[in-house]
Amino acid sequence: MNLFEAVILGIVQGLTEFLPISSTAHLRIIPALAGWKDPGAAFTAIVQIGTLAAVLIYFFRDITAIVREVVAGILKGRPLGTTEAKMGWMIAAGTIPIVIFGLLFKNEIETSLRSLYWISGALIGLALLLTIAEKRMKNQLRQGVTMKSMENIGWKDALLIGLIQSIALIPGSSRSGVTITGGLFLNLSRETAARFSFLLSLPSVLAAGVFQLYKSWDLIISSPDNLIAIIVATIVSGIVGYASIAFLLNYLKSHTTSVFIIYRLLLGSGILLMLATGMLPAT
């Protein structure tokens, strides 16, 4: 991978990691269209550390408050004594399903599930689910139901969204896409669903990134070009990712996810068309 490819893929990762359109799908599709090699699941996981840094910086106050209250709660013998401590434990519990499924289906995630047929199917499938979630939310609001804020998220919400997050292991589904969809079904406001989605992503993205970095370390340092490319892509993804978080949270305050639904349907259909005409290889 040369420096130009690294910058482009870093921008793509940063733009698409937090928008509900799947970063993994775009990191798979764009190299295929450009005639580049598939960067692979390991590259995707490592570069996500850049977008992880974006979440840490953007939500610095929230995260420090959560960590501080979790530690204080343990020391005082009241682990669930505050809202922030409770949120920390809910995030931890919500991370368990994706860790289990990620380990169980590790080989499939890194190989067969990266087929463009799977990716296009996931893009279209989640778009349809998100459409249903939006329509349900519209009906709920019409009936006078108040959408939940961060303070109203309970254990049931956290565990169900955590379980739903496991679907994001399928390339093309989108981690933020599936968790936001799950949040809407559970009567979270769009902004709250996105905010909780980003916080919930921290443990699993960190674990996946560190694991792949450890696993691929010898290969990375064997070539200075590979090392520089990954560093550049990670830094770029972090900078662009920060802007993406700010944009999405502000956008969802007054807009639905319709634009992302339409984009997913068009992209998924376009990939299927290119596969059918031989313009793209499936693997």
Swiss-Prot record:
It comes from the Bacteria. GO terms for biological process: cell wall organization; peptidoglycan biosynthetic process; regulation of cell shape; response to antibiotic. Pfam families: BacA. It is an enzyme of class 3 (hydrolase). GO terms for molecular function: undecaprenyl-diphosphatase activity. It is a multi-pass membrane protein. This is Undecaprenyl-diphosphatase. It comes from Chlorobium limicola (strain DSM 245 / NBRC 103803 / 6330).
